[in-house]
A protein has these predicted regions:
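Arg/Lys-rich, positively charged N-terminal/basic patches that mediate binding to nucleic acids
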Residues: 1-34
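Short arginine-rich
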Residues: 21-25, 44-49
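Residues at the C-termini of beta-strands that transition into short coil/loop
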Residues: 9, 64, 86
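Basic/aromatic recognition patch in beta-strand/loop cores that engages polyanionic ligands
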Residues: 39, 46-81
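Enriched for short, Lys/Arg-rich terminal
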Residues: 68-70, 74-103
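Short, hydrophobic secondary-structure boundary micro-motifs
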Residues: 31-32, 52-54, 93-94
């Protein structure tokens, strides 16, 4: 089954903030983060069901090289709705707010 992946603006902001942080640590690392996170997002069209729920119905697709980070998402019908690209150790309260905003 192939899903349509929806990426709202806050997810773009998450992705850019993490890439900028990585680029400050080592030039070029931010671009590597962007490439890998975009690859994971693109793969969700076909692999969304492979990732187990982490919180309620929120799933987490972990990045390989940047394994502390993941793409958080929910499945609604034929859509994968991205919630965030964040560090996996963050307290989940922020995630619940974004999930509630989906309705």
């Amino acid at each position: 089954m192939n899903f349509v992946v929806r990426k709202p603006r806050p997810v773009d902001d998450d992705q850019l903030a993490a890439a900028l942080w990585y680029d400050e640590q080592q030039p070029g690392l931010g671009d590597a983060f962007l490439d890998e996170s975009e690859s994971v997002i693109a793969s969700l069209s076909a692999t969304a069901l492979l990732h187990a729920p982490r919180f309620a119905d929120v799933r987490w697709a972990r990045l390989r090289r940047f394994h502390q980070y993941g793409v958080f998402y929910v499945i609604r019908g034929q859509e994968v709705r991205l919630l965030a690209i964040q560090h996996g150790a963050r307290h989940p309260a922020w995630l619940h707010k974004r999930r509630q905003a989906l309705g």
